[in-house]
């Protein structure tokens, strides 16, 4: 048998063959995956703020260090001598001299579109999609709230389907929730229990242009300008969004929001329980939540009814994330992202939220406050999206919005309801399946 002698150019040929195969594979991946199934897209408007932002300015208040965003639509593009383009108002402390510079500008959020999903399965409620608008065919992003064949109503900011309120799943609540940057947590005594509790009130500052505090030249202490303190108002939580502060929202489209969420980190000490009180407007009896790590139970009292759920074992050396949601007339309690209690509510809840440690009754106010602050961290209040009857600039309905959705059509809304042009205002109200481009990957 003669020995095999490869051609001298065989290694070069093999390298070229491998390169050609690699190029073909890359082209196929780009064509069928990146360009076909996962298409990049840049959000171009504020209609889905704050979940998805269009062009915006990212700012930080020099007074309270709160980070916030505003849209860029009404900003001048240039200013002389490196001066600020404009001044913004902090949504937390109402300081009205937050400078806006050109280098704070950001493009819209970059998202990916799953183009194959609309052809593989039906679109689900609360999903966000890219589609062509029925009036002019423009590409835009909205959220699906109404499905084919349903009768949809908008009442008091909520979505009703076939006469029943539609509760968002917990994951959707976390995706859609909007931070409430204003408000104060204050210590007060509960008359019924004699305990001091930490209560939240949506107190706002009147917009002001001078700092509340000024550092002394000779020390690290600060002086407060008492003669120039802004007045505070207890205004309540509303559907106003700081991104829209330069648009001048119609007064008729400003509404109080009762669908709130409280989140905090709890580091329990031994078996000491934690209580959360919510005010019930109708019965004037508080809804009480008692977290008891000693016997691993959560007890919930609503009017004359008492419910009990299992509480997971909570390590005392680690903080645990607690979420209490009142979205869509439903009480949801989660610990470390796991739901432990859900119950529909027939009552209206009013602020304040109030936290206390029942085992501290013999302690002074200062000692109780210290114990609460030692165990409770990162207190934050959120609100749900409030859907208005119509966007600003359109006549509002007198009672509620109602529509029946045809077959193979969908009803879509933007999260920034006051300034979203969507199914409420399009001449051709509904979006068909064939107009949908793909599902948004947030």
How should these model regions be labeled?
Residues 1-442:
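Extended hydrophobic leader/signal-anchor segments used for secretion and membrane insertion
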